[in-house]
Structure formats: structure tokens, C-alpha cells
């Protein structure tokens, strides 16, 4: 395959065009008055979004060289989204500014490597300033609501719903986003431990209106293998019948003979019982069964521990205040496990989360932690049309990520003001040579850009408002939503520190790589020859 090679100014100019194409499409979404972008889809209705990373991911340019520039800035948005969950548009705006001003300086003869060193030094200083400006969120649900609202483009409903969900499940809890079946957006909190396995037979149902089995104060038998024959569980069933309490059996599976006997006993009313399959698979199943055992104060009956079903005693069974089993889910409320044992299990899972390198494992461990320590809140997103619902779901997702980032590293004044306040830390800061100092100046100019862009998207003059904000101090800034200058912290216009930090670090990293590029290589497009004409038929005339 032949290659096309470009050098120096030619290469950088084409890369810059690609950067501008992508950044110009993304930056219109920034701020409370940012606009929507409509993305054509091969199947179904077009997608409407205000999510920067969603726009960036859709862009592929026909020119190979320009496309490389676009893909590099797409990487800025994607990495920022992966690390902080929000701030993708801000990162794109910062990258575009650093690249544009940087390339002008390279064209004027500045050394690209020195520029990059200056940029890196300035970014480290700005990050230091952001950390100084940062204020912890703690349990201030007002701040959590404000962060979520800003990230959801000023949607107060989303802000209050996320704050409500956080309040209910605490920091250790898990909040998931689902599509609502109606047009309402609401939060549903599952108290206690829920796992996605329902009753094995509908004959176990006690509430026929809801098709659920409700067990009050039941004993819970936890077994990690199949229960095939009745004689294995007969001793413990007889002991449970004597107590008069219901029983929940959690096992890998319950086969026909044992299941038929349980159903008959249930229908006769001699034993209120329900059987469900164990959640998870493989090693994860063992861990989840141990979690249930710790939560309910029971023991996992496992041959690995030398325990057999026929030898089970009442004190090996777990208990809970209530268990509700539907066709697909089981919820255990107020398990009788000891607080100290649950705390120890929670600490163990937290340690595993810190050590794991897999995103999937981390997510699953986080879910287990939530089920033990906090709870699970489901945020159901509804809208009149599917197109609007998907757009809203994108904003809810951003808001949730921003909220988690705020809890992690605190908050700074929003509206681009935190970056503007960081300019003072760069005043008088010099590099070891003129080009390094130019790199510092490039960052100094770039960190004004998010504020300017927010203002431009609100239909005002960016340069004028940026100058006014620079003249003031602390949290004073321009609220683009209301169109007035005010204390942004008091007005609730705040951003997560982590989002501001990660956006700048990623933007500077990719911009630095682009500025130090001297040669670009791409494949030559092959001209596909037109297919040969099919032979003409004689039409029967010879």
C-alpha cells in the first residue's frame, strides 16, 4: 500500500484544519445556552445531543490528514469522559486554543519542544491553583444538586433527582440510569440487597395481585450447589416447620424431585417457602453468596467448608426482616448480620476495588459494595419521544458523572471562572528560555477560552465579559443562564475540580503531541476502477 507523506507547515496546517472541524462542531454545546447537534443515523431517527463526547465520536473526515487531527482531539474528549465523566467540551475548547496559538508560534520559528515544556509547566501551576480553589462537598446535598444541575445544562429537575438519589444511597451506593416506560423522570430506591434472580416456580407466589412472594422474618438457607433430592433438605425443613417461620432457599438450582416437594408443601400450607437460584456465575457467585450470608447472619453451606445439607442446623441459617421475590428479582430487607461482620466485608471489597485493574471487575465490586453498604437507586429517565429521551439520558449520565467527580475532589467556581482565577498564578512565571515562556503564555490565553465560549454561546461578546471577570476576584463571574455578574458559588454555578483538572491535563497532553509533530504519514486513497460493462445481449437477433 503506497503512503502519502507531508512535512512541516503542510502537515501541521492539515492537522489544524481537522482539529478546527471537530472542535467547532463540539464547542457549540458548551454552557447553559449551548446549542444542540443533530447526528444522522443509518437506522432510526436522527440523534439530538448536547453531549460533547457523543458529537466528537461521530466525526470522521474524508481527508486522511485532516481526519488525523480530528481523531487526536476526539481522543481528548474520550479520555476526559473516561477519567472524569464530564468536561469533554471544555477539554476540546482548551485543546483547540493551545493548538491554534501554538502552531502560529511554531510557524514563526519557535522551538516546538520548548513550547511543549512551557505548556506542561504552566498546566502544572494551573492544576495547583485549581486544587487551592477547591472546596470539599462532604454531605452538602445543595452543592451536589448544583453540580448536577450545571452539568445537565441547567436542568433543575435532573439536579434535584440526583441529589435525592445520593441522599438515599449515600456515597457507597450505586445509582444506575434506566429508560422510563412513561414520560416521567423519577428515582426509585431499592432498600436492602437486591439480586437479579426470581422464584423458580410461580407456585411460590403469595401475593397474586403483584405476582410476588412475600416472606416475613424468614430463615434463609444458602447453598452453593444444586439440590437434587429431597432427603438432603428434609432435616432442615422439618426443623423450620417446627418454628412456624417461612423459609427462603438460595441454591445453584433445585431439581424436579426436591422442587415438587417444596411446591406441594407450599400449596398445602404446611411450610411457607420460596426457592431462588443463586445470583452470578463462577467465582463471582461464591462471593455474592458470601455477601448474602454476611448480610443475613447465615453460613454458605458448601462442601469446600466441609458442610453438608443433611447436617444443617437452624443457627446456620440467615434471617431478615422481610424478603420480597418477584419473577426476576429478590430483595432482602434488614438482614440480621452483625454490623462488625458487614463492616469487615465492606472493607475487604473496598481493598479489592483499589487493587483491581479491570473496569468491569471494578464496576461489579462497586455494585456488591453498594448492596452491602448503601443501596441501589435507579434513575428512570422519561420523555414524550424516544429522541428527546436519549438526549435527556445523555445529560443525566453527564450530571451523575460530574456529581461523583465533585464528591471525589471537591468543587470550584463554574462558568470558566476557576481557570480565569488561575491566571494570577502564571503572572511573572517564566521558563528557562523565551520559547518556554511563550508556552506558558499560550496556556495563559487558552484557559480564558472556556469562559469566552460559554459567553459567545449565550449570544454576548466573549472578550468584553472575560476582561470584566478578570478584573474582579474570587468567585465573582458571569452567570450565562441569567445574564448577570454575581458570586457564582452563591448562585450555585459550580464545577467539579476533577473535571476542570482532567480537561486541562488531557487537552495540553494531546496539543503538545500535535505541536511537536513534524511529519504525517497516511495511506494513499486507491482509485477503484469503474466495473466493466456487462456484455450486451443479442436480443434473439443473430
Curated annotation (Swiss-Prot):
It is found in: Cytoplasm. The keyword Chaperone applies. One of its GO terms (cellular component) is cytoplasm. Pfam families: Cpn60_TCP1. Signal peptide: none annotated. One of its GO terms (molecular function) is ATP-dependent protein folding chaperone. Its EC number is 5.6.1.7. InterPro entries: Chaperonin_Cpn60_CS, Cpn60/GroEL, Cpn60/GroEL/TCP-1, GroEL-like_apical_dom_sf, GROEL-like_equatorial_sf, TCP-1-like_intermed_sf. Its main location: cytoplasm. It catalyses: ATP + H2O + a folded polypeptide = ADP + phosphate + an unfolded polypeptide. One of its GO terms (biological process) is protein refolding. Together with its co-chaperonin GroES, plays an essential role in assisting protein folding. The GroEL-GroES system forms a nano-cage that allows encapsulation of the non-native substrate proteins and provides a physical environment optimized to promote and accelerate protein folding. PANTHER family: 60 KDA HEAT SHOCK PROTEIN, MITOCHONDRIAL. Belongs to the chaperonin (HSP60) family. Forms a cylinder of 14 subunits composed of two heptameric rings stacked back-to-back. Interacts with the co-chaperonin GroES. This is Chaperonin GroEL. It comes from Azobacteroides pseudotrichonymphae genomovar. CFP2.
